[in-house]
Amino acid sequence: MRNDQREVNQLRNINITTNYISHPEGSVLIEMGNTKVICNASIEDRVPPFMRGQGKGWITAEYAMLPRATAQRNIRESSKGKVSGRTMEIQRLIGRALRSVVDLDQIGERTVWIDCDVIQADGGTRTASITGAFVAMSLAFAKLVEAKTLKKTPIQDYLAAISVGVLTNGTEILDLNYEEDSEAAVDMNIVMTGEGEFVEIQGTGEEATFTPNQLQNMLKLGEEGIQQLVKIQKELLADKLLID
C-alpha cells in the first residue's frame, strides 16, 4: 500500500473541467490528485518565420508554475529574466507530443499556442499538462470546424501521458505523487496515443539502476494508466472529436 493508500496500479482521482477560462479557443483545468494545471489552447493566424510559405501549421507550448504551487515559494521565471532548463525541456516535450497526433498540413498557416500553468503541484505536472493540453487543443480545433474554418479536425489520434516509477523497495508504481517521486529509485514519464503507440519515454535511475524486467513492468503500468486517461478524454470529447 502506498503513502496515499492507492494500489500500485491505481491512478489518482482525475477530473477535467472543460471551458475553464472563457477567452481561449480551448481551455481545461485538469486535476490529478492534488496536482492542478490550467491548459489553454489559442489559435493564431500566422506561423513562426521558419514555417512561412510551407502552407502548414505549427503547435508550440509554454509551461509555468505559480510561485506557491509548491510547498515553498518559487521565484517567477519572468523575474529571473530567463527560462530554466527544466521548463524548456517540459515545453518542448508538450509541443512534440501534441504535434505527433496532428496533421499539420490540415491546419494551414496557423499556430496553436498551448499554455500550461500549474496552480498546484503534487507530482506529474508535465504528464498532466500533456493530457489536459490534448483536450484543450481538441476543443480549439472543434471550434474551427464549427466555424467552417477547417473542414474536419486535423487530430489523428488521442494522446495522454503518465508517470511510472520504482520505489526503493523495488515496487513498480503508477502515477507518482510528489513524495513518491522525490523518493523513487527510478522515475519515468510515458506518452502514448489512443491506439497504444509510444510517443515518448523518459526514464532515469535516480542513483539507481533498473532491469529489463522492471522496464517492461513500468511500460505495462503506463500503458494501462494511459488507456484509462484516454477513456476519460473520449467521454469528454464524444461530440467534439470525430477522428477518421
Swiss-Prot record:
GO biological process: rRNA catabolic process; rRNA processing; tRNA processing
Assigned keywords, A-Z: Nucleotidyltransferase, RNA-binding, rRNA processing, Transferase, tRNA processing, tRNA-binding
Superkingdom as given in the UniProt entry: Bacteria
Swiss-Prot/TrEMBL catalytic activity: tRNA(n+1) + phosphate = tRNA(n) + a ribonucleoside 5'-diphosphate
Coiled-coil portions: none
Entry-linked PROSITE patterns: RIBONUCLEASE_PH
EC number of the protein: 2.7.7.56
Record-linked InterPro entries: ExoRNase_PH_dom1 (IPR001247), ExoRNase_PH_dom2 (IPR015847), ExoRNase_PH_dom2_sf (IPR036345), PNPase/RNase_PH_dom_sf (IPR027408), Ribosomal_Su5_D2-typ_SF (IPR020568), RNase_PH (IPR050080), RNase_PH_bac-type (IPR002381), RNase_PH_CS (IPR018336)
GO molecular function: 3'-5'-RNA exonuclease activity; tRNA binding; tRNA nucleotidyltransferase activity
Binding locations of phosphate: R86, G124, T125, R126
Subunit comment: Homohexameric ring arranged as a trimer of dimers.
Family (UniProt): Belongs to the RNase PH family.
Protein name: Ribonuclease PH
Organism placement in taxonomy: Bacteria, Bacillati, Bacillota, Bacilli, Bacillales
Gene name for this UniProt entry: rph
